[in-house]
UniProtKB/Swiss-Prot annotation:
UniProt keywords, alphabetically: Coiled coil, Repeat
Disulfide links within the chain: none
Protein name: Tropomyosin
Species for this entry: Trichinella spiralis
Residue stretches in coiled coil: 1-284
Length: 284
């Protein structure tokens, strides 16, 4: 009987131990289940976050693509402005060459005027000494008149040439104004591009990337932004250089206009002197 009681007690103890182990196993299973659910929830959150990051990165890529297109357009406009400046330089050079040729003609006309004046003085002296040789004097006067007419024709030709130079200068001024307007538009566009790139940079900096691949892509985008910013600065520098070139050309045009006015005044004085000489010779 005692053996049976001991055996029953042992079985009860074993049963209690088994129940305790079962409860412990059940608790452990419950904890494992909670851990699995928590991990699944974290995984879902991570997946959502990754999808959000991917969407934001795609949006940033689109913005960078747009910025690249705008930058290429700006560089194209800067190249066009530089080409216009080069064309203006060539036109200024041609105008200077025309101006030099006109100056040479002016010198020739002035020399002929001096010769005509000297000839007129000589004719006056001969007329006083040899009043009886009227026929020879008259022939001499005709020669002087022909020389004076030739000098007047040269002066008129030079005047027409200077009028042509003035028209060309007016065209150059119009071209310069258009180039200045394009340079100003280019500067405004650069400011807009810089603002857009600043917004893109701020958006990229606000992204929270948790995976190594996303971090690498963000670094790549930041490098692209840095390169774009550098290219924008270069384009801005080129635009400023183009503007300075336009200002320099404007000063050169102003100088040529002043010289043109001065030379016209000289031609006017020569023409008046030629007319006066012609009248004096006609009086003889």
């Amino acid at each position: 009987m005692d053996a049976i009681k001991k055996k029953m007690q042992a079985m009860k103890i074993e049963k209690d131990n088994a129940m305790d182990r079962a409860d412990a196993a059940e608790e452990k299973a419950r904890q494992q289940q909670e851990r699995v659910e928590k991990l699944e929830e974290e995984l879902r959150d991570t997946q959502k976050k990754m999808m959000q990051v991917e969407n934001e990165l795609d949006k940033a890529q689109e913005e960078l693509t747009g910025a690249n297109a705008q930058l290429e357009e700006k560089e194209k406009k800067v190249q066009e402005a530089e080409a216009e400046v080069a064309a203006l330089n060539r036109r200024i050079q041609l105008l200077e060459e025309d101006f030099e040729r006109a100056e040479e003609r002016l010198i020739i006309a002035t020399e002929k005027l001096g010769e005509a004046s000297q000839t007129a003085d000589e004719s006056e002296r001969v007329r006083k000494v040899m009043e009886n040789r009227s026929l020879q004097d008259e022939e001499r006067v005709y020669q002087l008149e022909a020389q004076l007419k030739e000098a007047q024709l040269l002066a008129e030709e030079a005047d027409r040439k200077y009028d042509e130079v003035a028209r060309k200068l007016a065209m150059v001024e119009a071209d310069l104004e258009r180039a200045e307007e394009r340079a100003e538009a280019g500067e405004n566009k650069i400011v807009e591009l810089e603002e857009e790139l600043r917004v893109v940079g701020n958006n990229l900096k606000s992204l929270e990337v948790s995976e190594e691949k996303a971090l690498q892509r963000e670094d790549s985008y930041e490098e692209q932004i840095r390169l774009l910013t550098q290219r924008l600065k270069e384009a801005e520098t080129r635009a400023e250089f183009a503007e300075r070139s336009v200002q320099k050309l404007q000063k050169e045009v102003d100088r040529l206009e002043d010289e043109l006015v001065h030379e016209k005044e000289k031609y006017k004085a020569i023409s008046e002197e030629l007319d006066q000489t012609f009248q004096e010779l006609s009086g003889y």
